[in-house]
Structure formats: C-alpha cells, structure tokens
Amino acid sequence: MSEDTVPEAASPPPSQGQHYFDRFSEDDPEYLRLRNRAADLRQDFNLMEQKKRVTMILQSPSFREELEGLIQEQMKKGNNSSNIWALRQIADFMASTSHAVFPASSMNFSMMTPINDLHTADSLNLAKGERLMRCKISSVYRLLDLYGWAQLSDTYVTLRVSKEQDHFLISPKGVSCSEVTASSLIKVNILGEVVEKGSSCFPVDTTGFSLHSAIYAARPDVRCAIHLHTPATAAVSAMKCGLLPVSHNALLVGDMAYYDFNGEMEQEADRINLQKCLGPTCKILVLRNHGMVALGDTVEEAFYKVFHLQAACEVQVSALSSAGGTENLILLEQEKHRPHEVGSVQWAGSTFGPMQKSRLGEHEFEALMRMLDNLGYRTGYTYRHPFVQEKTKHKSEVEIPATVTAFVFEEDGVPVPALRQHAQKQQKEKTRWLNTPNTYLRVNVADEVQRNMGSPRPKTTWMKADEVEKSSSGMPIRIENPNQFVPLYTDPQEVLDMRNKIREQNRQDIKSAGPQSQLLASVIAEKSRSPSTESQLMSKGDADTKDESEETVPNPFSQLTDQELEEYKKEVERKKLEQEQEGEKDIATEKPGSPVKSTPASPVQSPSKAGTKSPAVSPSKTSEDTKKTEVSEANTEPEPVKPEGLVVNGKEEEPSVEEALSKGLGQMTTNADTDGDSYKDKTESVTSGPLSPEGSPSKSPSKKKKKFRTPSFLKKSKKKEKVES
C-alpha cells in the first residue's frame, strides 16, 4: 500500500433502530454537496476511485515482489510453471472475449485459439525470421478452414525455413486446420526427420511429406508448397483435357505440369519422373485423379496461385456441366487476353506507371490477414503496406502550438524520453526501408565536375535495378541456393568432403592451378606476350645486369695463362728487391758522419772531383753529393723517402761568402743548381758552424716544404758540367 494513505478511525457501529439517512444531518455541507452533485459527475468520481485503487495496487511493493518471484520462477523452471500457465489462459480468454478490443466474429465464435501463441521465451531458439514464417503458415491453415478447402488428411502446407540446412515447417498429423498454431508446427529436415518438436505431442506424417520433399529437392527456388484436393480440383485433375482457359482465373494461374501420382514418392524413379514433369519454372503441379499442388517463392505467391486455381476449377466444372462438352466452350487466347502485370496497382486515371511495387499476391494476402485480425485470430503478421494512408501535414510546426509545463501530475505515467522516441522513429524508418519492394544496385558513375576538368573520378551511388543500364543482354539467373549449380542426385557427403578438402588446402596455404579441364587437357597453347610486356621484361633485365656489373669488379688476370702469371710474379719480386736495395743505399748515404767543422779557408775542389768519395769530405761536398743522389732518385721514383733534417731560417744552408767569391762566375751557376735542388729535398742536420746572418730561430723539423720543378736552364748547365768533366 502507498505510504500517503492514512487509515481512517473506525466509526462505532450504528444502533439497531437507527436508519441509513439518520446517520447524516441535513445541515451537513458535505451531505448537501454530494446530494446536489449530478449523476454523471458521481459516476466519473466512482471510476476515478476505482482507477486509484488499481494504481495503488500496481505501485505497491508487495505486488512488485510477487511479479519478480513469478519471473524468477519462470527463468528457473521454464514455461511449464503452473502460475505462468494460468496467467496465459486468463490473458487468452480476456483477449478473445473482449468486445472492446476485437469486434465480434461474423460466425459468432465465442472462443477461438490465437494463431500467434509464441511468447518471448519461446522465440529465443528460433532462426532468423522463423517467427513470422510460423505465423504465415498457421494463417494459411486457418484460411483453408474458413474457405472450406480443408480435408481430413493430406492437406499440408509446408515452408522452407533455411536453404543452407534444408529445414521445413509442417503441421503435425491428426491436427485440423482450425487448430494449427505457430507453436504447434514441427521443424523437419529433407528426409522428414524431426529437428524441433512443436508444442503438440502428435508425430509427423512422413508419407504425406514425401511428396513435398521430392518437390523441394527438384526445385531449390521453391519456398512454399500448398497441397489441395477439393472436389473441384480433383474433378479437373481427372479430366483428360486438364485445366482449360475458360475464365480469367485460369490465365492468372500460369503454366501447369501433369504427373501420374500413385500416392507415395519413395522410389528413386518416381522422383526422377517428377523432376522431369515439373521443369524449372512451372508453379502448378496437377496430380492425376488426386488434386493439385501450388508452388511459390513466398507464402503470399503460393496462396495467390491456390486461390485462383480453385476459382478456375470451379468455373470449369460448372461450365462443362452446363455446356455438355468442351466443344461448346469458348476458350480464351493467352496472347489476346493478358492478365494484369505483377505489382501494377495504379491510381485511377494515372499514366505514370505503378504506384508501388510489391510481390505477387502480397496485397491480397495482407487483406486476408487484416480480416483474421479483425475476427480476433491474432495472426502476428507484419504489414508492409499500411491500411490508412498517413496524412501529410504541411504546416505541422504552426498547427500545434508549443506548450511548456513546469510540473508533472502524480496520476500521469513516466514520460517517454525524447531519445527513445527518436530511436523508435529511426527503427520504423529502417523497417520501411528494409521492406521496400524496390531493388537497388551499387553503381559507379563518373562525376560531372571531375569529367569537365579532364580527370574523371567515379562516384558511388545507389540506383534502382530498373534504371541501371544493362551492359549485356540475356536473361539473368536468380541465385538463391548456394548449391544451385550442383548436379542433381549427387551424394551430399561427397560435396561436403570436397568442400572440407578445399578449406584444408586454404589453411595450409597450398595453392595450385585447380582441377584440369578434360576438354583442354590435350591443347598446347603458345606463350605469347604483348610488346609492352616484352619491353618491360627487357628493361628489367638490363637493370639487373647493370646492378650486377656495378657490384662485381672484373678480374684483370682472368685472361692470363699460368706461365704469364708466374712471370708477372717474378718481375714484381725482382722490382721489390731493387727498391729495397736502393732504399738501403739512400739510408746509408743520408746518415750523417762525425760532426766536422767546416773551415772557411778550405781549398776549393774542382767540379770533376765532386763526385768522388774521400775519407775526409767537407759538409758542403757531402750535402752536394746527397742532393745529386736524391735528384736522380726523384726522377725515377714517384714518392722518394725524405729523411728528417734541420732547417735553419726556413731554407738550406747557403755556401759562405768566401766560397762564392773564390769560385767565380762559373762556380756560381753550379751553386745555383745545387741550391735549386735543395728546395726539393730535406737538408742534413747541422750541429755546428756559422749561423746565417739573419740569426732567426730554426723552424720545426717535421714541417714539409713544397716541391719545385727544376728550371730548364739549370738542366742545360748540368749537361755542360758533365761534358766538362
């Protein structure tokens, strides 16, 4: 109970002699107000009091705890709980007998079993779309019962649920058409074995299902089959002429196939004959002296065929009984009398084409579903076309004024959030988009702006299938079954083994050219390449050879013989020994002897004696001989060995003034030659003797001097000196 309600104080019981009106005083204002109140207001207040009591019960914690206990019990024990079963019975009884929700049936049915008896817990194990399929099949059974086309046996309506697994829905044996519900249908495989048992305890009629299984095996495109053997259809199936184009309904039926049915389809030969008779496109199968079977891609199409087939058979039977024979009947020609095209429902006086495309028989089937819903059958059918057209509001933003409230009444329920309303609206739009009969294709169209600039770029758009320009002519093949191109009557296990083998090869990354063609096995194709491919391959080959030539250096001795290599090695060793001997001689000559002071008054030797060796040689002569030897070695060797020496004042020690005066003019040329050669070589170290007149400190001995070429006039003077000697 609510906490706001406070129990009133108990009034004392009235005395035995006190009447009802004696309890109130006539002067009481509350009594006067209730007495003067109108009867309508009094009734409204009484209803409000009753609603208030219901609201208090729904908001009470005890009621909430009881509901939670029922939900927990359902989750633990399942749908077989006694409390849940009682609630279902009460809900079904109230829904079927309530005249305010559903109008009364024209046949005055006081109680009828609803078609959609699937609850939320039951639909959890169903496949995608199976709930709606069950409701459609059960509705077809009820329509057969209402039209009087139902028979006691072999009147079965089957539907293919899954093409991949080949599961089908069929009613159990022993259940009449008026008793079939969505939950009572049984799901079986192609062999008639039960996959999922319904709510009833009746078995499956495998003999009656054998005909349907043979049809589904021969026609993978068929999804629904309705077996009908009413008196009219059985009479036409027994005629040699078959169904004649006597009425317009016979033209709407389409092509028909005739088959001699013996009552069962257990033999393999019977299945092959049925496949040959049925063909790839026929939708009506006439069973001789038995009845007819209507096929369709959808439940709506199959019932559309059955409805017009029954009407055509009734017209033909009545016409033959009245005319007395086929020769007295006027037959219609298919070319002259064309039936209406599929989905061409148009407005009156309109020439702009179809109003809205739809599947065959969809509008008629939805009308019958609305009839069943109005009768209280609760079909559970999802309508694609609304019965009442939505009124367009051009000025909806100004027709309804804006209202703002700052408080919420306690009696009002919890307001629905705007986000939830927006989500529900989006879901409705999505459902309408998914249920559209139009077929759209994804097409790449060149952009006009980019096309004008000279670089066309494709633009992806969605277009209707009818508007897309077809590049190739021919009849398109509708592929609905993944095994559509598998040969008939093949071993399914063999197909599965081959599929598993291919998947195993893909897992192991084993790539091959695939199975070899038996027709092209003996054909030898010449390898031909285009000029562009040849040029690309040649340029690639040149680049590879160029890289290889840059990476590897050619061997200069690859063209020589062994004898030439031996001679070359000996020559290299000989030159190496000569260089070592010359180097030893240079070192011996460059080594300074004992320090001897040069006397300024020493006799001047002639140039002829300058090259001879003597035990006591002046430092000047020794330096001259050393310089001459170095000059001769510099002319033969590219990089002469330079001994370390001491450089005084940044240049060689020049001869003294006394020597220059005594030698004369001829001697001066020789000294100039020696002085020029001294700039190319390093001088010997001088430990004693007179320093240069400048007296500047000596530079670092490790510093190298720049070499100069010997002038040509000095070379001539050397030749003259040799001649004189």
Swiss-Prot record:
Residues 1-22, 525-725 are annotated as: Disordered. It holds the Pfam family Aldolase_II. One of its GO terms (biological process) is actin filament bundle assembly. Its main location: cytoplasm. Membrane-cytoskeleton-associated protein that promotes the assembly of the spectrin-actin network. Binds to the erythrocyte membrane receptor SLC2A1/GLUT1 and may therefore provide a link between the spectrin cytoskeleton to the plasma membrane. Binds to calmodulin. Calmodulin binds preferentially to the beta subunit. This is Beta-adducin. Residues 687-700 have a biased composition (Low complexity). The modification Phosphoserine is found at residues 11, 25, 60, 344, 530, 532, 535, 594, 598, 602, 606, 614, 618, 620, 678, 685, 688, 692, 696, 698, 700, 702, 712. GO terms for cellular component: cytoplasmic vesicle; F-actin capping protein complex; membrane; plasma membrane raft; postsynaptic density. The modification Phosphothreonine is found at residues 55, 533, 612, 674. The gene is Add2. Residues 566-589, 622-631 have a biased composition (Basic and acidic residues). The keyword Cell inner membrane does not apply. It is found in: Cytoplasm, Cytoskeleton; Cell membrane. Residues 701-725 have a biased composition (Basic residues). Keywords: Actin-binding, Calmodulin-binding, Cell membrane, Cytoplasm, Cytoskeleton, Membrane, Phosphoprotein. InterPro entries: Aldolase-II_Adducin_sf, Aldolase_II/adducin_N, Aldolase_II/adducin_N_sf. It is a peripheral membrane protein. Residues 596-621 have a biased composition (Polar residues). Found in a complex with ADD2, DMTN and SLC2A1. Interacts with SLC2A1. Heterodimer of an alpha and a beta subunit. Residues 425-444, 703-720 are annotated as: Interaction with calmodulin. Belongs to the aldolase class II family. Adducin subfamily.
